[in-house]
């Protein structure tokens, strides 16, 4: 049974719905297989090489179907598939006329076969032998017994095997339907697999020149993509297939797949097509039972989900040996080899199914992977450009736009290596260092985790803390204590010559970090060798301007909004003293050279009378 010309039409009109796959792509999947179609293939393919007759045992009974079914099932399981074989039940009444036509064709083929044997024409014998093949009820029962002894599930459909397979995919009991009949799509199977045979894997892997001619390329057709590509609803697709030609009713003469598609697109249903087409050009059959055919596709006779029993059982080894060796005269060595492969294949199927379960959750489409790769590459390039000193605009604080000038790179003498020294934070926790890089700062860009250019990305140790073992994880931060208490919200970073003390009434937001840096050495700077946190820092809502780090021109971490410049967090609103912008503009380009390599801008809310830069020894006057 099938739909005339459907596969070729889909390949032309909806190419994205059809793709060639490897048998490994079905690893861990449950596949519902049309058993009658498989047996038909085995009986045709496995024949005596001399007279193209069926393989038989000593009693003359055909064994081609048993040999083929056992071999293919083991091969599929070795590749990680879990097959379910579905057998045909009684044929539907609508198919009666089609079965009569098939009987007439078979009778004619038998006459031609007899004539070819008399003439000794081997080519004609081979051709007509395939046309006379018929799967008997006895062969079906033998196949069911073999599968049961192998521990493979068997489902007996009340009517058509294709429709039952399709509904197993609808019940989510199977991933796909494996059959050569395209009408499984019309019954609603989600995925249709064609050419699922023991040679498919080798054809896909080796791609030898004869594989495609022999039809060994494994093909997958996706129903959702078919409907999307054809731009049809499911009901329109069913009517389109009926017009193309099915086994349930006759067709309108003169209408092929292309004409049928155009008519469905224009009129949407067979009823409207019959009303509007030219009756002289297109001959509608007098007994055109398209309504019944449509109902057979939409509401086929199938087992409901609760009545479907799929049992994966352990193989019955002794009974299987007796069935093959005693009843059908299979070679004992060959049978032993098959059984050993079967037992190993069952383990492979279980293991690969579990692997597939875990990997399926993280699998990404090719398109998504490409987009992420391009985005990541773009981010890396932008980050490197910023680190190399390209001009950037500082965020606007609401009063004036802050700009930093590019200065020439100057060589800086290396500072003496700092000693590792732990100091206890105000909250009782000691931290040797943390970059506090939990969030990206728009002002300076995120650190590229994939970049290994240490010379560019690691400035002089005079300006950044030494890293400790704790930097590999997130450092725990406590919330700010009540206003008026000493600063407890930030982390303290230890430097060899610096020491931090917190003044009274100093307020930090919960994200603030107190950086202790090397002493600058200004004569008039208070507490030489130490940095103090100014008291009574002005407040703006919950945003606080306080900590003046004179040593390295750090403006005490101002968390306002989400905009950040360097390590100074600047947001919107007039939240700084009037002299902040002027001070920043006057002194921005006098920042230390190593910091300017990173294109950082530092703001000084309170300018000391005389502050001397580390290397240039130039004074910065009060704003």
UniProtKB/Swiss-Prot annotation:
Cofactor, free-text remark: Binds 2 magnesium ions per subunit. They probably participate in the reaction catalyzed by the enzyme. May bind an additional third magnesium ion after substrate binding.
Residue positions binding Mg(2+) 2: 181, 183, 247
I-domain, as annotated region: 124-267
Biased composition, class Polar residues, residue ranges: 502-517
EC number: 3.1.-.-
Enzyme class name: hydrolase
UniProt modification remark: Phosphorylated. Phosphorylation upon DNA damage induces relocalization to the nuclear plasma.
Region (N-domain): 1-106
Comp. bias regions, Basic and acidic residues: 410-424, 466-482
Entry-linked CDD domains: H3TH_FEN1-Euk (cd09907), PIN_FEN1 (cd09867)
Entries under InterPro entries matching the protein: 5-3_exonuclease, 5-3_exonuclease_C_sf, Flap_endonuc, HhH2, PIN-like_dom_sf, XPG-I_dom, XPG/Rad2, XPG_CS
GO cellular component entries: mitochondrion; nucleolus; nucleoplasm
GO process terms (BP): base-excision repair; DNA replication, removal of RNA primer
Region of interest called Disordered, as start-end residue ranges on this chain: 368-517
Keyword Amino-acid biosynthesis: no
Residues noted as binding DNA in the record, renumbered to the chain: 47, 72, 160, 245, 247
Keywords assigned by UniProt, alphabetized: DNA damage, DNA repair, DNA replication, Endonuclease, Exonuclease, Hydrolase, Magnesium, Metal-binding, Mitochondrion, Nuclease, Nucleus, Phosphoprotein
Binding locations of Mg(2+) 1: 34, 88, 160, 162
Protein localization: Nucleus, Nucleolus; Nucleus, Nucleoplasm; Mitochondrion
GO molecular function: 5'-3' exonuclease activity; 5'-flap endonuclease activity; DNA binding; magnesium ion binding
Role, per record: Structure-specific nuclease with 5'-flap endonuclease and 5'-3' exonuclease activities involved in DNA replication and repair. During DNA replication, cleaves the 5'-overhanging flap structure that is generated by displacement synthesis when DNA polymerase encounters the 5'-end of a downstream Okazaki fragment. It enters the flap from the 5'-end and then tracks to cleave the flap base, leaving a nick for ligation. Also involved in the long patch base excision repair (LP-BER) pathway, by cleaving within the apurinic/apyrimidinic (AP) site-terminated flap.
PANTHER family per the UniProt record, alphabetical: FLAP ENDONUCLEASE 1, FLAP ENDONUCLEASE FAMILY MEMBER
Subunit relationships: Interacts with PCNA. Three molecules of FEN1 bind to one PCNA trimer with each molecule binding to one PCNA monomer. PCNA stimulates the nuclease activity without altering cleavage specificity.
Family: Belongs to the XPG/RAD2 endonuclease family. FEN1 subfamily.
Protein name: Flap endonuclease 1
Encoding gene per record: FEN1
């Amino acid at each position: 049974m099938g739909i005339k010309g459907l596969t070729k039409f889909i390949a032309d009109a909806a190419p994205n719905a059809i793709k060639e796959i490897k048998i490994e792509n079905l690893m861990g999947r449950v596949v519902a297989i049309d058993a009658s179609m498989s047996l038909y293939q085995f009986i045709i393919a496995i024949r005596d090489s001399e007279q193209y007759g069926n393989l038989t045992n000593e009693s003359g009974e055909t064994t081609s179907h048993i040999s083929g079914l056992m071999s293919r099932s083991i091969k599929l399981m070795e590749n990680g598939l879990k097959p379910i074989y579905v057998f045909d039940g009684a044929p539907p009444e609508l198919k009666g006329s089609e079965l009569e036509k098939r009987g007439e064709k078979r009778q004619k083929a038998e006459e031609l076969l007899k004539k070819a044997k008399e003439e000794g024409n081997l080519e004609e014998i081979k051709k007509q032998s395939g046309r006379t093949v018929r799967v008997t009820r006895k062969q079906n029962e033998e196949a069911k017994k073999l599968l049961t002894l192998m521990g493979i599930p068997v489902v007996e459909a009340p009517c058509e095997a294709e429709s039952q397979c399709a509904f197993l995919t609808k019940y989510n009991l199977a991933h796909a339907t494996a059959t050569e009949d395209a009408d499984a799509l019309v019954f609603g199977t989600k995925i249709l697999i064609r050419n699922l045979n023991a040679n498919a894997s080798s054809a896909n892997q080796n791609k030898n020149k004869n594989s495609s001619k022999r039809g060994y390329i494994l093909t997958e057709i996706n129903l959702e993509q078919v409907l999307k590509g054809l731009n049809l609803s499911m009901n329109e697709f069913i009517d389109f297939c009926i017009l193309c030609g099915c086994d349930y009713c006759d067709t309108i003469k003169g209408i092929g797949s292309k004409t049928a598609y155009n008519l469905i697109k224009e009129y949407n249903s067979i009823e409207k097509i019959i009303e509007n087409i030219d009756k002289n050009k297109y001959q509608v059959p007098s007994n055109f039972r398209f309504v019944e055919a449509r109902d057979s596709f939409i509401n086929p006779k199938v087992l409901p989900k609760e009545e479907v029993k799929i049992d994966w059982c352990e193989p019955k080894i002794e009974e299987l040996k007796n069935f093959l060796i005693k009843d059908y005269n299979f070679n004992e060595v060959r049978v032993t080899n098959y059984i050993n492969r079967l037992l190993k294949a069952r383990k492979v199927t279980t293991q690969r199914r579990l692997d597939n379960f875990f990997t399926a959750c993280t699998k990404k489409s090719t398109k998504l992977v490409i987009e992420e790769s391009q985005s990541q590459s773009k981010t890396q390039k932008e980050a490197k450009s910023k680190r190399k000193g390209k001009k950037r605009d500082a965020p606007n604080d609401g009063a004036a736009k802050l700009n930093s000038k590019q200065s020439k790179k100057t060589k800086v003498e290396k500072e003496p290596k700092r000693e590792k020294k732990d100091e206890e934070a105000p909250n009782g926790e000691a931290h040797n260092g943390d970059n506090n890089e939990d969030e990206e700062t728009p002002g300076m860009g995120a650190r590229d985790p994939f970049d290994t250019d240490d010379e560019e990305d690691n400035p002089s140790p005079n300006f950044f803390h030494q890293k400790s073992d704790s930097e590999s994880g997130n450092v725990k931060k406590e919330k700010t204590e009540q206003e008026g208490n000493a600063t407890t919200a930030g982390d303290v970073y230890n430097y060899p010559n610096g020491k931090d003390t917190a003044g009274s009434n100093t307020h930090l937001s919960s994200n603030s970090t107190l950086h202790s840096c090397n002493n600058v050495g200004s004569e008039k700077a208070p507490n030489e060798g130490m940095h103090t946190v100014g008291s009574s820092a002005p407040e703006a809502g919950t945003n606080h301007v306080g900590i003046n780090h004179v040593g390295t021109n750090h403006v005490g971490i101002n968390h306002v909004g989400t905009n950040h410049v360097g390590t100074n967090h600047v947001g919107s609103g007039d939240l700084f003293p009037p002299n902040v912008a002027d001070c920043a503009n006057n002194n921005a380009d006098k920042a230390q050279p190593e910091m300017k390599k990173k294109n950082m801008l530092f703001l000084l809310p309170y300018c000391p009378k005389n502050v001397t830069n580390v290397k240039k020894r130039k004074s910065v006057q009060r704003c």
